Amino acid sequence: MTAPTTAVRSLLRFITCGSVDDGKSTLLGRLLYDAGMLPDDQVEALLRDSLRQHPGGDVLDFSLLTDGLDAERQQGITIDVAYRYFHSARRSFVVADCPGHEQYTRNMATGASHADLAVVLVDARKGLLPQTRRHTYICALLGIRKVVLAVNKMDLVDYQQDIYEPIKDAYSELAAQLGITAVHALPVAALGGDNVGTSSKHMPWYDGPTLLHLLETIHVEPIQAADFRMPVQWVNRPDQSFRGYAGTICGGRVKAGDEIVVQPGVHRARVARIVTADGDLPEAHAGQAVTLTLDREVDISRGDVIADATRPAPEADQFAAHLLWMGDEPLLPNRGYWLKIGAKTINARVTSIKHKIDVNTQASLAAHRLELNEVGYCNIDLDHPIAFEAYTANPTL
């Protein structure tokens, strides 16, 4: 294993996605192996599992490291999102291995919602498939702007550059149409480790970095809202002398003395204290869990948003939004639903579906319902106003 180090490493959250059988789990398992993150006993267990799954074989089946569910191992596919945590000498990683089958697209979307970057796999024999386009569209919808394109199974096409290049060009064109600003492409053969952790001797025509080196060095700026926002998770009232409002800051920063507004609404106050388990802070920023006390009593409940008084979030009880429908039953206009945003849950109705989107062509199509895994642009009506922002500005709100 990699020698322990006390150096502070940056953290990269990424997903592996693409169509079924493109080799996502194998690639991720190989990446863990090449990063030196598999202890000897786990390698021995992997060898036993590989022999059990492939009697008479002599190659490690790296997909078994991440395909944890029995149903997945038996079918040779990924159903659930498998999360792994590992590090190299330069960086720490949280990776979500996402399922490739269309019926599990909602699982993939869940993984993508927490990722800074996507590693999209394409089988060199098949090129771009509908599910490749679907996953790329969802990544773009959820704010992922940098993608690593891994054209896998190059060993099965004799490592030919003239097969790799058209796939790279076609994907780059698709990504540009969806607003993905950077595509880093490389040819790999996950089973043998070509260009995963070490450069491939079979593809001298490729002189770029390996996948591991690319993940270690790529610069990704996560979405960070500039304006202060904190959804209230609970009102902390241990006794009559203390009333605080606890939550995790999802945007910007706040200092003692700053003027805030409670949303939805117009009630204003100033921050008296920023309380944590380690004592009071003079200032707090996005990602920190804190308790705020105010200089006067204000009616605040769970789900309200404490925001910068000079730059509050928009408020409305009607708006339009893109929806990726994850329910087994279809979404129908004017049926009652729950809408959860931040720490608030309220009654909602989709008053109309303006159109649904063909994720393969990005065409807008007429629709009267949304089925599982379909994306639509919908008008939404709420019982009362909420504070909200565009996903690209603040994913929490």
Task: Give residue spans per PLM region.
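Conserved Switch II/interswitch segment of TRAFAC-class P-loop GTPases
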Residues: 91-94, 98-104, 112-136, 142-165
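Active-site phosphate-binding and catalytic loops of NTP-dependent enzymes
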Residues: 2-4, 53-58, 67-79, 175-183, ...
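C-terminal effector/interaction modules appended to NTPase cores
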Residues: 2-17, 22-25, 88-89, 239-397
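Alpha-helical scaffold elements adjacent to nucleotide-binding pockets in ATP/GTP-utilizing enzyme cores
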Residues: 27-31, 42-45, 107, 131-138, ...
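Residue-level signature of catalytic and energy-coupling elements of molecular machines
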Residues: 21, 27, 46, 76, ...
